[in-house]
Amino acid sequence: MIYWIFLVLAIICEVIGTLSMKYASVSGGYTGMIVMWLMIATSYIFLAIAVKKVALGVAYALWEGIGIVIITTFSVLWFGESLSALKLGGLAMLIAGITLIKSGTKKSVVAKKTTDSVKNIAGKAKQVATVVKGVNKPISSNVKEA
């Protein structure tokens, strides 16, 4: 659970950093650039911690995808950028892609049952091998044939 919190923090820092970059380019001040550098660096640190337990593909897709959706929303609201039907379609496809990637990483019940079955069969095979090995012991040299 803690790793998901780090992923959320990484997304928040990335959004703040990217919006600060836009603010710096519009205002011409250095404050936005300093905030951008700090937030982007912090974002990568949090992302690096998150991927210790969250699948890299999922973490990166969520980090970039959710970040893009939030950044686009605030760019329209704060900076007056346009949002066309084509951009909305792209954002919808992005969200659909993130959903597919996230849902594809869950371990299914079938996979667990298959793994358990393979382990069970391997255990039985080991037992059989032990029995067969005991039956196939060589006849000792001190036993005389009749």
Curated annotation (Swiss-Prot):
GO terms for biological process: glycine betaine transport. Coiled coil: none annotated. GO terms for molecular function: amino-acid betaine transmembrane transporter activity; antiporter activity; choline transmembrane transporter activity; spermidine transmembrane transporter activity. The gene is mdtJ. Keywords: Cell inner membrane, Cell membrane, Membrane, Transmembrane, Transmembrane helix, Transport. Its main location: membrane. Belongs to the drug/metabolite transporter (DMT) superfamily. Small multidrug resistance (SMR) (TC 2.A.7.1) family. MdtJ subfamily. SUPFAM superfamilies: Multidrug resistance efflux transporter EmrE. Catalyzes the excretion of spermidine. Forms a complex with MdtI. The lineage of its organism: Bacteria, Pseudomonadati, Pseudomonadota, Gammaproteobacteria, Enterobacterales. This is Spermidine export protein MdtJ. Disulfide bonds: none annotated. It comes from Proteus mirabilis (strain HI4320). GO terms for cellular component: plasma membrane. It is a multi-pass membrane protein. The chain crosses the membrane at residues 1-21, 31-51, 54-74, 76-96. InterPro entries: Small_drug/metabolite_transptr, Small_multidrug_res, Spermidine_export_MdtJ. Pfam families: Multi_Drug_Res. It is found in: Cell inner membrane.
